[in-house]
Amino acid sequence: SPTKTLTMTEILAATTADDWRPNSPDNTLYLEIPSGRVIMELAPNFAPRHVANIKALVAAKYFDGLAITRVQDNFVAQWGDAENARPTAPAARNLAPEFDRADGPDLPFTTLLDADGYAPTVGFSGGFPAARDGRTRRAWLTHCYATLGVGRDMAADSGSGTELYVVIGHAPRQLDRNVTVVGRVLRGIELLASLPRGTGAM
């Protein structure tokens, strides 16, 4: 007989305490906007240099008072210093990209059976949507709804975390391995997804 597809409610009802893990305070990022608080989790296993740089920027209060600069329907909400006018020290302004990482037995990975047009294998790594390629032995975080990424210009090393974005629409998977992904939204995605859309030129 065909396998029964479970609803989200049924999946959650079937979980046990062992299926959940506490969020690490060291890797928790808070974004305060007028409508409330957005809570995000950083992913140092995939982008350690960018995560460290974002933490340094936060400690230096780099983001304090900056604006949400872009809200594009069915795409992203983005914030930071779009003009790069604010000093970043002691954090770096440019970092080598961390589009993917070496795969191996030390990387936890729960494989999904679904076929995927962007990666040989998809699933979750430490709770983050992820993909892997057994041929190249590389793994990366994927651009799914609520993904947290690093904005950049054309140069691959132009993103350091001074501009961040969250996916608020369909999964723009063409960005996988083209932009550094540093985490995901745990709570408050609806606050970003409901922001007024921008009307300015792109």
What are these regions (language model features)?
Residues S1-M202:
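Cyclophilin-like peptidyl-prolyl cis-trans isomerases
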